[in-house]
């Protein structure tokens, strides 16, 4: 059980929720200029390594009660030197935080080169359950690509990681899914196909002969899914797992 908790913590820490100091100054200025009546929670920013003249900014805006908090999301691409907005995407009710709590946002600048001219970036979102008996963690990703003054969301809430199970007094079971998003060799509607390569593990938690609480993997499965661009977005299969 301790190992499961460590795994959940490790996955959470893998979500880069801390902004680069080089771009943090723009967060307050953007909030004051465009969202002066609202308070942002867990904003992040990152200078884009693929084009350091541009900076990616994610501004989440919570609203609602403690039981259910809805997050409006403003994703912006700005000029690194001036802070001027180049393109953005505004999405009301983008995410909800309830019994499964939203714990942070991160910016993914992996090489999502969709064609010779278009390169996407990702926004990762982490969720975590509050139960120690039924631990749960999930990480989703959205992908965005610039088109003139707009940032088009082309992948919506693709689940990349899940971890959970049921355990009490060193008895129980667990399951983990860990997926990576890769570029395929083929293209559809001028954008590269995306390969979701997933590894699923299931197992049990028990006391071994030495009285130690250990985990034992009983099943391991690898799968792949291909996402095809339809001219607007990459629709996700149902269910992805």
PLM features: what roles do these ranges have?
Residues 1-8:
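Bacterial N-terminal signal peptides that target proteins for export
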